[in-house]
Amino acid sequence: MKILLCCAGGFSTTMLMDSMKRVVKNSKKLDENTFTFKAIPVDLLQSEVEDTDALVIGPQIAHKLDTIKPIIEPYHIPYVIVDKDTYGKMDGATVMKMVFIAQKKAQMNK
């Protein structure tokens, strides 16, 4: 599963990405070899979106959703917007749960 994390500059999202990687690595149910993560600034989304399975949007760019949706909709990529509290705690476990829920919903709507 390729998970793309997107924020204003890609720096703080890298810390969240590392937390998500630890969750996958420490999980008994998930195989870390089947996951790839990448943190990018929103300005690079168009060039990075292909082959993405889920998009994680940082709270600092939630207001750009109207710009983001037209980029990801042709690829049918499920997305989550991380709330400020979860983001501030760098809570990778909660974000991974959000990603899995978004993926399930997307599969049910196919």
PLM regions and their residue ranges:
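A short, gly/pro- and small-residue-rich
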Residues: H63-T86
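Class I S-adenosyl-L-methionine
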Residues: K21, K25, D66-K69, E73, ...
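Short, Asp-centered acidic motifs that coordinate Mg2+ and/or phosphate
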Residues: A54
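Ser/Thr/Gly-rich flexible loops in soluble cytosolic domains mediating phosphotransfer, phosphorylation
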Residues: P78-K110
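Conserved active-site segments centered on acidic
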Residues: K2-L44, D51
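Short glycine-/acidic-enriched loop or helix-start segments at secondary-structure transitions
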Residues: M15-L16, V49, L65-I68, D91
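Short glycine-rich anion-binding loops that position phosphate/pyrophosphate groups of nucleotides
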Residues: G9, Q60-A62
